[in-house]
Amino acid sequence: MTQAALAMSMTDPIDTTADAGLMARIDSACQRIAPLWPLKHFVAVNPFLGFTGQSFAATAATFERVVRTRMLMPRAFYRQALDDGRIDDAALAQALGAHPSTGLELNELKQKARAEAGTSSPPAVVATVAEVLDRLAEGDRYVSLVAFMIDEISAFCATYFDEGQASWPSPVRKLKPYAAWRTIAAYDRNPEVMGLTGFRKAIAELPADPVQAIGVIVDRLGIPERAVEDYLVRALFDLGGWSAYARYIGWSAGLDGQRDDTLLELLAIRLAWGYALYQARTDDAFKAAWAQAMAEAAKLPADQRLEETPELAIDLVLHEAYEIALRSKLVARLAGHGAQAVTRLPARPPVQAAFCIDVRSEIFRRALETAYPDAETIGFAGFFGFPIEYVPIGHSKGGAQCPVLLKPAFIVCEAVKDADDVEQSEVLGLRLLRRRAAKALKSFKVSAVSSFSFVETAGLGFAAKIATDSAGVTRPVPSPVVDGLDPEIAARVQPRLTPGELAGRATGFTDPQRVAMAEAVLKAMSLTGPFARLVLLAGHGSTTVNNPHASGLDCGACGGHTGEANARVAAAVLNDWQVREGLRAKGIDIPADCWFIGALHDTTTDDVTLFDEDDVPATLAQDLARLKARLTEAARLARLERSALLGISNKAAVDEAVIARSRDWSQVRPEWGLAGNTAFIAAPRSFTRGLNLGGRAFLHSYEAARDDGHRTLELIMTAPMVVASWINLQYYGSTVNNAAFGSGNKVLHNIVGQLGVLEGNAGDLRVGLPWQSVHDGSRLIHEPVRLNVFIAAPEAAMDEIMQRHQGVRDLVVNGWVMLHSLSDQGTIRRCVRPGEWRSA
């Protein structure tokens, strides 16, 4: 490693002054990539996030032309829907009306739908050097240069970005990515073994600055001016997984008000590989093929006209018709239900139970309302309005317990209830000691020197553990929540709200902050009175084993963590008598006999755990006992409803079977997560109570009459609605094209760097959901449709919010979500654009 390379620190700025135009194209290309959160807090992300500024149809054309991949189902899927009657003539006619540029008549469309899709490519596409070389290759022993390049870059990224899985850290970790890769490339002979002569020389000739290197490569490859940005986008999507992770690093830096160029540097690495391949081939055949590819790229259309890709246009219309047919049924059910009489609750219900808006909560809320008819259920984002960083005992930093669109505003540390300073120190010291011992044992097990001798000498000692893990009696890996803590101590752990300090950072809440947060949360929940005697705040999480994507089943509103911390913090704040005094001065009067209690809904087993029961006043003991009994009954009803999709045929043994799935380390489908999501409804519960939405709708409580200035409506449309669209589109992408937007076969997953998975032992980092999350082995469980949003609010207010927030406007106008207004009379109208609403 050279001294010059070592001198280039991680904080050295990138020179962006050489070519402002090129830098603008680079930034634009990088913005096209959606971020990928690491496994420890894996959250759903819209894979088309960088394309929402253009229409859904235009994006489909862009992906076919630039990325060379589809974002629609195969033609056979829509043909089957026609045969099954799920798409009717009315839906086809309406879809054709939305795409007049196709020039198709109804009968002509039906004929084409029943024919196999043509294989013709778009009129102009973007090709890379490696792709052109692969086209020229002959013989069955040829190794794809595209695959080889991706494997090599992926291997570098796995070592460079490793978050603690590797025993030996990368020696160039302190350098920026491009400098680190060039340092290693100077010694790497793998490319030359593959026949890429002069690889190291070509890389050494490139500028050390990544932006300058990109400029040189673009110039020497002769990429047409019109195609430069598309070429950069294509290069990034060649490494879609690692590009997405690099984008996450930049996203996180952006929340802190900083700029990070990791993705730009990865782009430079990818282009440098292409440049080295280009330099290695000087034969006439390649020169002619490359010239032809660049001539095609120069003809790229300035827009994405559907008539230029007729086969895509047909599939877009068929997909639109498929969605219209499904949406029509949903609209009819909502409109019909809204006109029915709704069972009235007591003026003061005995229990108010707030759950996350997650679609899995819809099933449990219906079950609880069946088991406890007088109870009122509420839907709200599962972080309960408290954007906190929750720091466990023994840690200096914690996870962000809030939507990834936000940055934590408060730091809350974990503490042991009723423990003095001496006991707190003992617990901390013991947990740190156990963590160090576990780390040392792991290092010994995987060490190159001791791994074989360890297995030979201690292998039999693990036989009992393997047996109990296989039987579901014990967990293969301890829960990180209680890892290193004695059971008695783990039962006493709780969040500490009092102000303090951690490594120079303020923790806890001041009294004014508690009052302000409590007021904001209650108003956002439309919960300002009357209050029940017991108010349940139920976050949610999941229980699975041997599941790399386990955090993806936890609460997305809590940043891929369980909602326990947020529920307990919110309940503790709202039970504070000083907070209640402050709220009373603001017009919110919480009665003295009202108590908030935090809880956690396990979406895998449907069990509900209540926290801090010892703090509940004795006068509410009977109320609490009644609630626990009703929750147990609701859990049984919810498991019974979910058992059909889980394939549990023995209804008498549903409870045991569901719990067994949560402990089975060979189970690839412990639960269905948010598969099937189709709708987001923000309205009073009276609009949907008694309506079976099949666990397919996000339900957010909202009462426009209580929303002065429509501030809560603005929060709903800019946060929960956007997050719901991210979830919906991740499931959509993982269903329509799992190879591009999903993570493939879960059985083949290998964790890399503790941050993501590979499918097998090589290739790109995988994004999105495993195939098993959307398909049961014989049929799709998730229907690939865009999110239908229904909000019971004035249309003019929604228009104003869309005008103020371009991101929300883009989602609606460009067809990424279908926004509807709901009225008390059951009238439903769809928004075409701000100011234009049509009957649905």
From Swiss-Prot:
Compartments reported by the entry: Cell inner membrane
Cellular-component GO terms for this entry: plasma membrane
Keywords assigned by UniProt, alphabetized: Cell inner membrane, Cell membrane, Membrane, Metal-binding, Transport, Zinc
Cofactor(s) the protein needs: Zn(2+)
Gene: dabA2
Membrane topology: Peripheral membrane protein
Oligomeric and partner information: Forms a complex with DabB.
Residue numbers binding Zn(2+): C356, D358, H540, C555
Protein family (similarity comment): Belongs to the inorganic carbon transporter (TC 9.A.2) DabA family.
Matching InterPro entries: DabA
Domain of life: Bacteria
The organism of origin for this protein: Bradyrhizobium sp. (strain ORS 278)
Function per UniProt: Part of an energy-coupled inorganic carbon pump.
GO MF term set: zinc ion binding
Record's protein name: Probable inorganic carbon transporter subunit DabA 2
